[in-house]
């Protein structure tokens, strides 16, 4: 939700993720493909003529944004390369030319693409989906093909993400929420359970098929440049023209919007994410080269900090770690130590309520936290501490600290228990 002020500086100006609805462009192709699959109108291995990336719909010309040089290919491949021509032709031929535009609109509504998410934050607009053949909605012969590629519809980033999250969640659509529980002094005082919007937005077969399509986009399509060797993600790139209008024989474009919506890990999704960049200023404006790198950075950082996403290096029974690999005689702030050990799921027993503690390994595969005495007006024992904790304690006592080495404190020049009177203490780290 970073915006740019007139002076060129960036600021949290407006909650665009919730409050700004735009024509999404190619990320909406997922909905078009899922509608076709749900109505059993296409097979992913069917052939489709992409006409080299240029086609005519009545008096309007449609061009594929990213050149691909393909003519006849599979429906699957047309989606991977994000062919406007391919997806638009499929929807036009199966719904438009057969007079079944109402069936396509019904499917979009089945996917809840015409409804708010209901998030408890003010300012969410209702997504815009035209009513079939409505003069009031300016329905025309090009409406269906244009809707299929993300035009003549509007949706917010959060609403689009809710749809993609449902696909990642095997069809179950959940209401977005920001708060899971409220705690006071470490105790939960109120919980907010997850709320299901719809148990299944499409059949299992259709969901399985579009999940494969989204994985294909990353493996072989418009997102392959940024696929990861450490984990697999799935998603769809999007590039949309903004404020466009026809002036005679040419089209005037007022700007672009780049986006990427996806989830990871692809085989067992835990996180979904959408990145939307309105009017990028880098000189490029394609979703695959502007928004996708941002998604990848977010996914990389999330993956690196979630230990549950890493595979165990050893599938054999755990070796006894006590006195070998578990920390022993390490000293630190008790609450910090407890937080780290809990996060790493290392069993421990706390035997002190004091501020500072020392870790001791037991004979079994566990730890115990014991009291580390910090007498007032006397030099404490900081051996085993990290430098940050040692400096905090010693400098607050009025001592001057000299440091040699890196790591944890191995030796200190002044004996613990010595009365403090502004001396200089030297710490040897290792």
Region spans (language model):
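C-terminal, active-site-flanking charged/polar segments
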Residues: 265-269, 273, 277-313
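Beta-lactam-recognizing serine transpeptidase/beta-lactamase-like catalytic domain environment
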Residues: 1-26, 31-277
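Short beta-turn/strand-loop junction motif enriched in small, turn-promoting residues
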Residues: 169, 280, 414-415
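Generic "edge-of-domain/loop-turn" microfeature
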Residues: 55, 268, 280-282, 408, ...
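Helical mechanochemical/support elements of P-loop NTPase systems and associated helical scaffolds
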Residues: 159, 291-294, 386
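Generic structural signal for hydrophobic residues
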Residues: 32, 103-104, 294, 298, ...
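Ligand-recognition elements built from short beta-strands and adjacent flexible loops
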Residues: 130, 275, 297-430
